């Protein structure tokens, strides 16, 4: 009797295993399809080469590439450049009218500024004036006010 009662259990297990195998086969086939689709899109974009960027797309790309440094629309020129030079080309000429790549965009990024120490930043703030200077400044501004009617002669 043990074999008879286990027969339905074995049939259920066998059918369930076959169902899982089919399900796994379908899932793996769909995964393979999506994987092939992704690879195809990557290879076609890799062979497409540089693109043209204009307007807001160009600005967005420059902001992404340069980050906090900022960027120039024209190539920065050195001091003392001659006035008889060729007309200056900018990022629009290079990336909108023609195609450009990432290296070309990076050429228009502003240079990195050296980090300032906490002391030099504090020295530049106008709120850190000595107390005596603040008081003098306040006294001088209140002299000519017409709201104060206590004039001394």
From Swiss-Prot:
Biological process terms in GO annotation: insulin-like growth factor receptor signaling pathway; negative regulation of apoptotic process; negative regulation of release of cytochrome c from mitochondria; negative regulation of smooth muscle cell apoptotic process; positive regulation of cell population proliferation; positive regulation of D-glucose import; positive regulation of glycogen biosynthetic process; positive regulation of MAPK cascade
Region (D): 111-118
Keywords, sorted A to Z: Disulfide bond, Growth factor, Secreted, Signal
Positions of the UniProt region annotated as C: 78-89
Propeptide segment residues: 119-153
Subcellular location: Secreted
Family membership: Belongs to the insulin family.
Classification via PANTHER family: INSULIN-LIKE GROWTH FACTOR I
UniProt-recorded name of the protein: Insulin-like growth factor 1
Organism: Sus scrofa
